[in-house]
């Protein structure tokens, strides 16, 4: 959204800062509470919630109710995964670029970011004995992204969502 509204550099800067928002919470939690895997796993959940429901983007609706604005949390979700295990961030980023290019829907790409982290950390828990808390993070992040992207999902199901990437040229 930032890239569409203000150009490539603003969009890139915004994406980097949003990724660092998620990763930074994990790094801080790991530093201060290295043995509390559940607290570490929930740190980026709160970053996603703060991103999606920012007090800095608060508005009143027509009935006067306060509505907190924000994004979907995809970049913050990627950052959370990056904070747990940096190779996961690279794996997810590469797969997300491929999904975006070949599937062509930004919302599907955003949802896949958290879903991929669930699979990666479930695999690490099974194979390497990692804490299951990180896989649970992926499930919660996926749920938050699905909730935030409800309008996009409705457009997808109706066939009205914007197409990007390779499929747009077909």
Kindly give the residue locations of the regions a language model identified.
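Short alpha-helical transmembrane interface motifs in multi-pass membrane proteins
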Residues: 9-10, 79, 134-137
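Mobile late-domain/C-terminal helix-loop "cap" segments
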Residues: 120, 136, 140-150
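Nucleotide and nucleotide-moiety/phosphate-recognizing core
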Residues: 10-16, 21-65, 83-88, 96-97, ...
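Loop-to-transmembrane alpha-helix initiation sites
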Residues: 90-91, 106-114, 129-141
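Interfacial segments of multi-pass membrane proteins
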Residues: 3-6, 26-33, 71-103, 116-125
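Interhelical loop and helix-boundary elements at the membrane-water interface
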Residues: 1-23, 52-75, 102-112, 148-170
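Alpha-helical transmembrane segments
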Residues: 23, 93, 143-147
């Amino acid at each position: 959204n930032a890239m569409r509204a203000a150009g490539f550099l603003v969009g890139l800067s915004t994406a980097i800062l949003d990724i660092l928002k998620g990763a930074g919470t994990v790094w801080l939690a790991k530093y201060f509470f290295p043995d509390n895997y559940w607290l570490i796993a929930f740190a980026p959940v709160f970053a996603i919630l703060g991103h999606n429901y920012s007090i800095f983007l608060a508005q009143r609706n027509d009935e006067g109710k306060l509505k907190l604005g924000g994004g979907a949390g995809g970049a913050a979700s990627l950052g959370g995964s990056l904070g747990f295990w940096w190779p996961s961030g690279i794996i997810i980023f590469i797969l997300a670029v491929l999904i975006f290019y070949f599937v062509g829907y930004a919302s599907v790409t955003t949802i896949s970011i958290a879903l991929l982290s669930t699979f990666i950390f479930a695999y690490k828990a099974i194979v390497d004995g990692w804490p299951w808390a990180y896989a649970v993070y992926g499930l919660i992040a996926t749920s938050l992204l699905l909730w935030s992207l409800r309008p996009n999902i409705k457009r997808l199901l109706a066939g009205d969502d914007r197409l990007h990437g390779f499929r747009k040229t077909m």
